[in-house]
C-alpha cells in the first residue's frame, strides 16, 4: 500500500494537509460511476452529493473521515485553508460513513477560481468520539485536519485520497 503515498506527496497533500504516513487501511471512494484515484479530475456537479465510500477493517474498529479543500478560496491565496466539507466519526470498519456519526454534513465542491484539491483523510480512532449533533452552520473555514487529529488523539492517517475540481462554465443559453 505504500505506493499510494507518492501521489499525495506530488499533489502536496502531504505537507499542506497531513504529515507523511504509510497507508494501512483500504478506502475506496466513488462519485456516481467514477472511482476516485489520487489527482483525478471530478466535476463539481458530479460531486454535488456525498460519494460512496467503503472502508476496510474490522467492525470493532472505528474510523473518522475528514474531507477538506486546502485551496480555499483560491490556490494562489489559500487564506481559508482548510475548508471543511465533511466530517464523520465513529464509522465501523468494513462499512461506510452512513454507519457513523455525521459531525459536519457533506458539502460538495464549489471552487470559485482555479483548480482546487479536495482531500479525504481517514483516521483510525482509539476510542469512540463524543459526536455533537450534525451542524449545518459549523465553522468550515480554517479547519485543520492535523489539529482535529491531535485533539482526538488519532495519530497519523491510515488512508487518504484527493481529487481536483474547478468551477464549471455556466450553461450558455441561446437567444433568438
Curated annotation (Swiss-Prot):
May form complexes with phosphorylated ligands by interfering with kinases and their effectors. Pfam families: PBP (PF01161). It comes from the Eukaryota. Belongs to the phosphatidylethanolamine-binding protein family. It comes from Oryza sativa subsp. japonica. Transmembrane segments: none annotated. This is Protein MOTHER of FT and TFL1 homolog 1. InterPro entries: PEBP (IPR008914), PEBP-like_sf (IPR036610), PEBP_euk (IPR035810), Phosphatidylethanolamine-bd_CS (IPR001858).
Amino acid at each position: 500500500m505504500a505506493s499510494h503515498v507518492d501521489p499525495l506527496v506530488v499533489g502536496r497533500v502531504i505537507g499542506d494537509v497531513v504529515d507523511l504516513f504509510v497507508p494501512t487501511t483500504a478506502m475506496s471512494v466513488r462519485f456516481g460511476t467514477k472511482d476516485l484515484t489520487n489527482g483525478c479530475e471530478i466535476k463539481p456537479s458530479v460531486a454535488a452529493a456525498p460519494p460512496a465510500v467503503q472502508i476496510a477493517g474490522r467492525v470493532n474498529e472505528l474510523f473518522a473521515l475528514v474531507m477538506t479543500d486546502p485551496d480555499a478560496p483560491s490556490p494562489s491565496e489559500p487564506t481559508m485553508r482548510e475548508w471543511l466539507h465533511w466530517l464523520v466519526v465513529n464509522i465501523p470498519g468494513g462499512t461506510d460513513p452512513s454507519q457513523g456519526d455525521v459531525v459536519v454534513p457533506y458539502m460538495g465542491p464549489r471552487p470559485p477560481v482555479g483548480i482546487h484539491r479536495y482531500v479525504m483523510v481517514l483516521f483510525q480512532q482509539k476510542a469512540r468520539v463524543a459526536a455533537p449533533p450534525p451542524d449545518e452552520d459549523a465553522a468550515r473555514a480554517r479547519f485543520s485536519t492535523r489539529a482535529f487529529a491531535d485533539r482526538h488523539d488519532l495519530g497519523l492517517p491510515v488512508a487518504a485520497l484527493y481529487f481536483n475540481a474547478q468551477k464549471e462554465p455556466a450553461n450558455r443559453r441561446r437567444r433568438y
